[in-house]
């Protein structure tokens, strides 16, 4: 009895705590696009129709059970089928289904048909990151899980507990997708390897990313803010480490962001033609390694025996640089290609791998990567 009282008290305390239900909800989000709000309205309409049907059906059933029970001396009626009743209980559900199907069909058409978009963004799923391309603006970048979340994966239990209490744990990225408010955006969604799924609940968008195919979706965000999503298709060991973060900003801020990204691109192209020092390459390479390579080869370069080779003492990192450059550019069995990275990033990460972890490989310059492409 004492154990039962203790357990009951603990449950009551948990239910009564504010933190237990601070962000807990059973309902879907309304979202910040007209489309997501239409979907929410459909969801709620169907819910209340089901509630009304449940009240009528179960109300009639329980009333019949109680009011016509045998203990009250009620005798069951003896009658055959009623054509009128059969028409009623067939016709009413048909009318309900038609009433629900009309707005649902309209919303489905709105989801699938986009007459004109103000801008286009190509979304490419890659194990285990997202690549975003703005073809009209000439902008392209890869979005990885934020380093703050990566660091805690192998942290102490106390450090993990501290981060688990943060709402952005495993939901933050190093580079956000940026979109202007009140702008119709067409998303072209594909994959470089396996099937992924690009899902942003606030947009009402959830679309498969299939290798070799391009699926499209669209959204017109109406509110400025930061919105999060996730890969919604089991895609390998780090499936849970593929968050999506979208910043919806004013049109003026978006124009400034585009200008800054285009300036970064010019600077990046210029950096690929210059000679870098080993220290500069190693410093930059460590950041690239932690974002793109540490998930498999581990942050300390130890790898996972029998699965992912170690960087420490590797024949690749201590061997000819040309072979390693080709491996990073084109991939290998069990390792994806990293052509989406800039020449400077590839040169930096290769140099980091070849000059860290006790290795004594040669330094690689961005021009070496440019020549190998």
Model segments located where?
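Short cysteine/histidine-rich zinc-coordinating motifs and their immediately flanking basic loops
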Residues: 242-247, 304-310
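Non-transmembrane, membrane-proximal soluble domains of secreted or membrane proteins
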Residues: 22-45, 65-279, 283
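N-terminal secretory/membrane targeting signals
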Residues: 1-22
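Flexible coil segments in periplasmic/lumen-exposed cytochrome c-class electron-transfer proteins
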Residues: 261-291, 336-373
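Detector for the c-type heme attachment site
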Residues: 232-236, 297-303, 329, 351-355
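Alpha-helical transmembrane segments
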Residues: 43-68
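Sequence/structural segment immediately N-terminal to covalent heme-attachment motifs in c-type
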Residues: 278-304, 312-313, 318-330
């Amino acid at each position: 009895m004492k154990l039962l009282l203790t357990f009951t008290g603990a449950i009551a305390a948990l239910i009564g705590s504010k933190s237990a239900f601070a962000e807990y909800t059973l309902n879907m989000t309304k979202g910040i696009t007209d489309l997501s709000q239409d979907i929410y309205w459909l969801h709620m309409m169907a819910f209340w129709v089901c509630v009304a049907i449940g009240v009528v059906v179960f109300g009639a059933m329980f009333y019949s059970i109680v009011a016509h029970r045998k203990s009250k001396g009620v005798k069951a009626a003896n009658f055959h089928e009623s054509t009128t009743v059969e028409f009623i209980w067939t016709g009413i559900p048909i009318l309900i289904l038609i009433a629900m199907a009309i707005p649902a069909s309209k919303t489905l058409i709105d989801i699938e048909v986009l007459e004109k978009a103000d801008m286009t963004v190509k979304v490419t799923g890659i194990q285990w990151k997202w690549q975003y391309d703005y073809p009209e603006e000439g902008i392209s970048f890869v979005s990885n899980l934020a380093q703050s979340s990566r660091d805690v994966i192998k942290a102490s239990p106390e450090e993990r507990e501290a981060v688990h209490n943060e709402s952005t744990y495993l939901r933050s990225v190093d580079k956000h997708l940026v979109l202007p408010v009140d702008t119709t955006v067409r998303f072209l969604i594909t994959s470089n390897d396996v099937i992924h799924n690009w899902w942003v609940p606030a947009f009402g968008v959830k679309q498969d990313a299939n290798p070799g195919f391009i699926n499209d979706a669209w959204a017109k965000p109406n509110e400025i803010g930061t919105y999060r999503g996730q890969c919604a298709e089991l895609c390998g060991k780090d499936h849970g480490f593929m968050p999506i973060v979208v910043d919806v900003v004013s049109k003026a801020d978006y124009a400034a962001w585009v200008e800054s990204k285009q300036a970064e691109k010019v600077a990046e192209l210029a950096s690929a033609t210059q000679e870098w020092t080993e220290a500069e390459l190693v410093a930059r390479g460590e950041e690239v390694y932690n974002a793109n390579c540490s998930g498999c080869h581990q942050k300390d370069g130890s790898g996972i025996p029998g699965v992912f080779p170690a960087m420490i003492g590797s024949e690749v990192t201590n061997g000819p640089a040309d072979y390693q450059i080709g491996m990073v550019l084109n991939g290998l069995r069990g390792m994806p290609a990293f052509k989406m990275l800039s020449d400077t990033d590839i040169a930096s990460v290769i140099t980091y791998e070849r000059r860290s972890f006790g290795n004594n490989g040669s330094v690689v310059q961005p021009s070496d990567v440019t020549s190998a492409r």
